[in-house]
Amino acid sequence: MAIQQEIIAALGVKPTIDPAAEFRVSVEFLKAYLKKHIFVRTLVLGISGGQDSTLTGKICQQAISELRQETGIADYQFIAVRLPHGEQKDEADCKDAIAFIEPDRVITINIKSAIQASEATLSEAGIVLSDYVKGNEKARERMKAQYSIAGMTAGLVVGTDHAAEAVTGFFTKYGDGGTDINPLFRLNKRQGRALLQHLGCPEHLYLKAPTADLEEESPALPDETALGVTYEMLDDYLEGKTIDAAAARVIENWYLRTEHKRHPPVTVFDDFWK
């Protein structure tokens, strides 16, 4: 099997989708998981104002609303978490995303002071963080806050990882990659966009240039610039289409180099790294 087909199979991507049906797949998946794990009462998700968290948030709120109605358990709750580092440049988009999702509860935690404290403590020990590593600190601090909220509310931390992100490993290990459940897994970027269009989401939330926006020396650096390929190329590749050979090599190199991110901690029984 060619590596492209191996990747497509591993990530479960379909060449075409029915947006309405895929929305229901994700909603029913979350509902079934919570019904199986009866001690879980909340879903916790960080909202950035971008496509992925907006879609995931809408899925979470729909699942929780249906669970309350179907089970009669009023304790079920979706908690949307705002996690700015200082002043967020796309604050208006975040507010629009929250308005679209209509979460049961919104919690805002500014992580800037926590990052500054961590940076200062490490510096005292002789470890001076680069801008890149500090960016990963931000991603991990955001997840730490979400897990604290989940721990106090009998919750699960929900991830936004999807196929176009997973194939490149474009997430922080034990940061935004460290979650309990990922309802977007199997969808690529354009498919996620199609779901939001189906749901009537304001288009500026899914047409904006995706950015992790973690590095202060390169603020709002577009994902596509960091990756060296466009999401259109990634989506075409994941749908089994033939793309430019150079772009395909970039995607495959990312996939192979970041395998450790998609795998539990390596043990003596693993051989994927050899």
Swiss-Prot record:
Binding site for deamido-NAD(+): R140, K173, D180, H260, K261
Matches recorded under Pfam families: NAD_synthase
Stored InterPro entries: NAD/GMP_synthase, NAD_synthase, NH(3)-dep_NAD(+)_synth, Rossmann-like_a/b/a_fold
SUPFAM superfamilies according to UniProt: Adenine nucleotide alpha hydrolases-like
Pathway: Cofactor biosynthesis; NAD(+) biosynthesis; NAD(+) from deamido-NAD(+) (ammonia route): step 1/1
Superkingdom of origin organism: Bacteria
E.C. numbers: 6.3.1.5
Catalytic activity: deamido-NAD(+) + NH4(+) + ATP = AMP + diphosphate + NAD(+) + H(+)
Record keywords: ATP-binding, Ligase, Magnesium, Metal-binding, NAD, Nucleotide-binding
Residues where Mg(2+) binds: D52, E165
GO-annotated molecular function: ATP binding; glutaminase activity; metal ion binding; NAD+ synthase (glutamine-hydrolyzing) activity; NAD+ synthase activity
Residues binding ATP: G46, I47, S48, G49, G50, Q51, D52, S53, T160, K189, T211
Example GO BP: NAD biosynthetic process
CDD domains, sorted: NAD_synthase (cd00553)
GO CC terms, sorted: cytoplasm
Its job: Catalyzes the ATP-dependent amidation of deamido-NAD to form NAD. Uses ammonia as a nitrogen source.
Similarity comment: Belongs to the NAD synthetase family.
Assembly mode: Homodimer.
Name of the featured protein: NH(3)-dependent NAD(+) synthetase
Organism of provenance: Sodalis glossinidius (strain morsitans)
